[in-house]
């Protein structure tokens, strides 16, 4: 119980346990899910509203600070603003009531000092007066002090940087009621050290008297300079230990920011998620600041600058990171289960967010409540010095941070998941297109792999927030969202100067917020300690009660007397150049009111332009707001075979295909065909046209396609049916193909849209193939069922027995030693010398770099690894080896080879080169070759397992030494005697072919993929077995992997499609699985062969009375194993 009251940062991992959620947790989680659900249903609305609210808040802050100084500059006119100089002053009382100790009092306005000696103590700082290149600061006697003012110099107080500063200082004390007159008199001090005789001389100008001479641009610069000067003064009068602590605090805060970005990068977001977390924190700060100041709690910049770094470091960004990890994990889990769930139970993006909130929401709220409670306790404490005020502000910041986490940030996560879905869709589609698949088929496959599933339509558009968009709109969407937010705020900031200062009264909610930027009260003892000591001695000796107002230091700068140019600046009109007009308008010197500013032609055009941009932006954002994610209401339907393409939901008009309907004439049918209305003809009419040669057999699918009449699946199925009839009735072959039309070859209920243009032509149906699973087999710590499509009995059972033995020894371990598909074109040259020159150039660094750049430019996935050349007469063979991502990659690499050869012929001086063939059998593809066995092709994998001796005897019914001897004599010596290349195994091809057929691989590549050497040895009484397969050619996208049944098997193995973060990992994992399955098959067959009773066991336990096929070593081996098992059980 006590552990639950500790925040997550302080709890150990062991303290978290899965228990039944209590009543409070269920209620809190339900509220959070409801809030986040409403926010995510309208993501654009949520983001825009919150961003505009935050913009309004900080515009109020700036309107009361930065631009107030800009407006006020027009009222200075070279005069001293005494009230401005007095801001930040502190009052100190000394007398009997304070036991003759300095006591800090409240502001001057709230005190009555009648009958008290009220003095003012001011310090003048002359910038750079001690530097060699500058004039000397004036002495105290050189100041133009009025005759009726009794200002007396007192010792000034040095600061931390005084020993190496170039500034000099003077301090004066005088009666407080003489301060305005005194400051106005000393706003300009002559420079007595100047040697200038002619013209205007420089003077020491008080900082407050410099504003109006520079127009609006100068006023803004003045504000920035004042802010920087205040910061420097604060540093100068701070203690060393305070500076060290604050420096460490700010360093820690920025390290927290860096840690946030690294954490989000590990979760898959390089920038945007971390940036939105920071935006959410800034919004929470603005809202908390608004509420705090509205409630009358005084907050200033000094308090914020000292407290915020430690608040950021203490609270951190753990909660957004935890929620992000939970949402992304839930999305990945839902996506993984999407292929196994029925259409009525498919999870959506919102379901992922709801699941994450259900798992982590209550714990996050609990942590917020604990932290807020601690801050409330700090705010209620009696500790002075700003702690109470900052704790009050921090509690509100955390409250709004919690609210924004489950509204603003969950909306951002919803958009992130949507963008991730679009990226997966586009990546898969482009990878399929690069592998040679048509755009339409690639789009269908990518749509069927989408999560959540979207309607597959024949277009190049994708869905975002329920609306179809082009793929190129994704990046534009992100840029417009961010750019739009920035633009709205730029317009807000830029229009502030055009608002009348009286407008502040119309925003009472923001009236107190501007006080945040008011000058921070100074520490009088750090600024004027020596002067106070002098006053103390005088007051104590006279026993006179004294109040001293310590005025913040006033800076002087040596420059020409700008106050004299103020009058000239006031006389400027709109007749001068437009640039000056605009700057004066921004500064507020010409604008008397908003109405007057609109009358100016330049300003009015600027306002109209800003208004136009705002309207365009709002139109885009609120049009995008209609893209809200809405969950479709899905009525429960009975279980039925799932079809990936959901186009059949559309209702189509019925067409009359009754064979008894009178047939149209041939001329009418041809007219329908020319009008591209052939789909309206009956089947018999279409068969007749095809037999007469009017419709080519390969064009039936294209002819049948009519989206207004039927779906593509139905049209293609009809095309297959018609083609079967055409083949059966073709006069030249009807004697032997006549039975095809009514044969048992199935053709219905198959998605031919994935076949057309990708896998097969002239389709007349599909062949069902028995599919079994072997295993489970543990591979690198993960258990798999191995899908195997075969017509050879007991092959799956044999592999399963090997898997059982391997699992008993701890599973198989695999190592990937190479990954690179190859293509070996043949090029010819007129002479041997030219061919040799080309070989030397390709083998050089220059040739390799040029060909690599050309090759890599053709694909986002293909990356050239190695070039190998061989010369045969005037023919040059070049073997390109490259990575191909998760595709098997033959088409992808062929495009790269063509591009590289073109660049070599046209740009590298080999224009006499002739490309004989893009494939010169130097690859080598679909043929047994020593080059594949030595250099590898595709994935090179080694799989190993250690089988305990007792498992060999009990499960495999064999002996370790017998297995080792059999492997040496059969697989090694026997294959060598036969002159085999890569055939040093028992039956690797059996398993490779079965897995290839089940997972949509190219069965013809079984030739080189089955190259394998099996090794065995006795390791301390245990059997160590390994298979080395240097050329496994597999892919998880493209080819037959796009078919529904085959992709389901890839899904079962967890390697379907392209890997989301590291392209190529899925294909490499499939190669590991194939090698481990071969290892299991090799172990089982060799064990059965080593048993020595194959013939007797096969004859005794053969279940087929009549011979239906020739027995194989596998069937005999597994039958022998069954016989031995049955015998032992008896």
Curated annotation (Swiss-Prot):
It is found in: Endoplasmic reticulum membrane. Pathway: Metabolic intermediate biosynthesis; (R)-mevalonate biosynthesis; (R)-mevalonate from acetyl-CoA: step 3/3. This is 3-hydroxy-3-methylglutaryl-coenzyme A reductase 1. It comes from Aspergillus fumigatus (strain ATCC MYA-4609 / CBS 101355 / FGSC A1100 / Af293). NCBIfam families: HMG_CoA_R_NADP. Residues 68-242, 292-296, 388-389, 498-601 are lumenal. Glycans are attached at residue 148. Changing residue 412 to S: Contributes to acquired resistance to azoles. NADP(+) binds at residues 859-861, 886-894, 1102-1103. Its main location: endoplasmic reticulum. The active site is at residues 792, 926, 1002, 1098. Changing residue 305 to P: Contributes to acquired resistance to azoles. Residues 242-415 form the SSD domain. Its EC number is 1.1.1.34. GO terms for biological process: coenzyme A metabolic process; ergosterol biosynthetic process; isoprenoid biosynthetic process; N',N'',N'''-triacetylfusarinine C biosynthetic process. The chain crosses the membrane at residues 47-67, 243-263, 271-291, 297-317, 367-387, 390-410, 477-497, 602-622.
